[in-house]
Amino acid sequence: MGGILQKSRFVIHLDNGLFNEAVLFDRTNLLIDFPLGRCDTVIDFGQINGVVYTSEFKNEREVEFSPLKNQEKQELLNLFTNQSDETQQKSLVESLFQLAGKRAFYPIDDNDVRKYFRRTVEDMTDAQRKHCFEHIDQYYKVIKKKIDCLAGNYAEKEFFRQREKDALMMQAMYSFKTSIAPTELATSLGKSLYEREGKISDFETMMLRKILEDNGVNLRWWHRNDSKKGFCINSFINHFPDFVLLTEQGTVVALETKGEQLDGAGSKDRIRAGKDWEKAANALNDGRKYRYMMAFNQERLEGAYDVAAMLDLLRSL
């Protein structure tokens, strides 16, 4: 079974003077020169409110929060308010960095992250610093989202810049195993690649049944792709399609099925990355055709499919 199908992924070629070697491309390569220090600190903290917590740093990666009583809250606020502006800023920066932990934004350097926290805090008014102190965990989440967004935008631009320069190439780098042993099993359905496939959700089962029960779809097999160790589209984001399908005509389909609540910005990124993978894989001219599809029960995003459109396309493959 291991020789049934190989799937293509992006690689970079390294030349050490003796021979040229293809190395699997890693998204972190895109962020090595990410200039976080030149990025804006325009962040909307307007939605933050709620209970004040005290935090206990158990280790580098784990923080425990406990709600404060009114008296404790007031005592801490008084201590913070009576500090100088510079001391307040240092305190907030240190708390934010402790919440992040070391190498939280790898490969972005920790010093650059700390400096970004400082610039963000320095932009705050007295009232904003006090509010940040009261809701430090929520502020961290908002700042983290901002950094992730900045890094994501940079990674996408850098990825396509390298694609234009042919610095990234497509090559068969993933093969299916001869057998799998899922810890949780899916409902037994026909035409699965393996005797038993890994667990799938009720929504995924419903979408898969629609495909299998459609008389016009000629499927050779389907496989539930493992979300951690399976086939990954290694683009400006790394993501694992829910299913890999092979049609009788030899078309390989990377299929993602999305519930209606999962149609945010992340899905848009996946569609762009998936369509680029499709284009690059087909350019190999290896005798197969490749398709990337994201399907909703009802179409919600540009570039995605509803059930009817998904089935209509699969019938033609």
Language-model region placement:
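Catalytic cores and motor modules of nucleic-acid processing enzymes
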Residues: 1-240, 245-254, 262, 266-272, ...
